[in-house]
Structures are given as structure tokens and as C-alpha cells.
Curated annotation (Swiss-Prot):
Function: Inhibits potassium fluxes in cells. May regulate Kv1 family channel proteins by retaining a fraction of channels in endomembranes.
A molecular function GO annotation: identical protein binding
Oligomeric and partner information: Can form homooligomers. Interacts with KCNA1 (via cytoplasmic N-terminal domain) and KCNA4.
Protein name per the record: Potassium channel regulatory protein
């Protein structure tokens, strides 16, 4: 392979060598424009095209040009800066992928309010993500067992969904509705896939917390009740970040990158 088959770029002091076809993957980009003379901002110095941009982030851009997918380290935190670099190079596909990444990686917050009052326990679950609330609503069932004198059949409890005041919260409660079990109904809570029907508020709280943990949430804070109160609040957070963002187009594998030491 001759030197004419390669292009060397000095991006912010870091040297990258690749094929012209790699830089022309997206013909409308400024990287393609620097090779065909459309973009006069980039100058050739000592056989290298100088680009006054972030060299460390350019390695991710070059990898995207090679494979048409973006693979970032798990601890990568410069998504906005990388998107800014993609905007500079006019790589619209990469800008769109990063916008998708930032949208998908937004954190979801859940608040569980728990009030233990006499023989009943009341729950209110608030979520920033309505889809998570919808998922919980489909898994939580309240079973209302009425006294035998009213129903004649104690073994056929009435199944009810939790209340949905809005798209972002749900309400339910469990326990006995009266001082004596034979005077009023008893509400049990079941949370799928667990088949148990629980009436004790503390047990239901434990099952609800376990359900959220299995869904990828982690507990970030708690608020203990003030003196004379019995309400508690548990705050959970879940951050989902895709590891690989790819385009629908089949990646090309013909490109090669050969980094060289930085020149002073």
C-alpha cells in the first residue's frame, strides 16, 4: 500500500492515519469536504491535515466512520462534547445517535410513600416514567375479601387494580377495613410474578421494594417519619444507558487506523 492510499490527520496534536474512503463515508460531512477541496478551513502542514479540534474525542468519531456504530466505555461521560464535535464535522447520523443515547440514558425516579395506620397500610407510588407506572399497575392486584355474612363465600375475593390518579402515580392499600376482621373486608396485595396475597403493610412494602430492585432501580434516599407520624418515603433511581448505538446500514470493515505518537 502506497502513501497515497493513506491520509494523515493531526487533530489537536494527536495523529491519525486512515484511508480516504473512511473519511468519505458520509459525503456531506466536512471530513469528506476536506479531501475534495470543498472545505478550505483545513490546511495541510508537513503532509498532515491539521484539524484544530479535540483529538481524544476524534478517535470515537473515526471508529464510527469505520463501523457505522458507536461503542463507548462504560464510564464515558462526555456525550455532549462528543455531540458538539459531531456537529462541527457535520456528521448528522452521529449527532442523531448521540441524541438518541442522551434520551435513552435519562434517569427514571420512583417515590414510594408508605403510611401505616392502625390496621391498614396505604401506598402511593410516583414515577417520572409513565411506562414504569403502567408496568407496576399491571402487576399489582388488590384482593378484597368481604365478610361471610355479606358474600356467603369467603373464598372468592374481589380482584381490583390499583387506582391511577394520573399517568405518573398509583394508589393502593391493604389490611383490615375495621377493628375486627368479621366486621369489614380485608384487602390483600399481590405483585406478579409473586403469587402470594399479603395483607401486612410491612410485607407488601418489602415485596414492592424487591420488585423495583429487580427492575434495575436502586435506593438513593429515605425520609423517616417525623415525631408522631407514621408515613415513610423511599426514593429509587434507575439509569439506563445503551452500550452500543448502531445505524441500520451495514458497517464497512475495509478501513484501518494506525495512530502515531503526537508531534510537538
Amino acid at each position: 500500500m502506497s502513501g497515497q492510499d493513506l491520509v494523515t490527520l493531526n487533530v489537536g496534536g494527536r495523529i491519525f492515519t486512515t484511508r480516504p474512503s473512511t473519511l468519505k463515508q458520509f459525503p456531506a460531512s466536512r471530513l469528506a469536504g476536506m479531501l475534495d477541496g470543498r472545505d478550505q478551513e483545513f490546511k495541510t502542514v508537513d503532509g498532515q491535515i491539521f484539524v484544530d479540534r479535540d483529538g481524544a474525542l476524534f478517535s470515537f468519531i473515526l471508529d464510527f466512520l469505520r463501523n457505522h456504530e458507536l461503542l463507548l466505555p462504560s464510564d464515558f461521560a462526555d456525550h455532549h462534547r462528543l455531540q458538539r464535535e459531531a456537529l462541527f464535522y457535520e456528521l448528522d447520523s452521529l449527532v442523531d445517535l448521540l441524541s438518541q443515547f442522551l434520551l435513552q440514558s435519562r434517569s427514571a425516579v420512583m417515590e414510594v410513600h408508605f403510611l401505616n395506620q392502625n390496621t391498614q397500610a396505604f401506598f402511593r407510588v410516583f414515577g417520572s416514567c409513565s411506562k414504569t407506572i403502567e408496568m407496576l399497575s399491571g402487576r399489582i392486584t388488590m384482593f378484597v375479601e368481604r365478610p361471610t355474612a355479606l358474600t356467603g363465600n369467603r373464598n372468592s375475593p374481589l380482584a381490583l387494580p390499583p387506582q391511577r390518579p394520573s399517568h405518573h402515580d398509583l394508589l393502593f392499600h391493604c389490611g383490615s377495613d375495621g377493628a375486627a376482621e368479621n366486621q369489614a373486608g380485608v384487602r390483600y396485595i399481590s405483585i406478579k410474578p409473586d403469587n402470594r396475597k399479603l395483607a401486612n403493610g410491612t410485607n407488601v412494602l418489602g415485596l414492592l421494594v424487591d420488585t423495583l430492585l429487580k427492575e434495575g432501580f436502586h435506593l438513593v434516599s429515605t425520609r423517616t417519619p417525623a415525631s408522631g407520624e407514621k408515613s415513610e418515603c423511599y426514593v429509587f433511581e434507575r439509569i439506563t444507558t445503551p452500550q452500543v448505538l448502531g445505524m441500520s446500514k451495514t458497517p464497512k470493515s475495509e478501513t484501518t487506523t494506525m495512530p502515531a505518537p503526537s508531534q510537538k
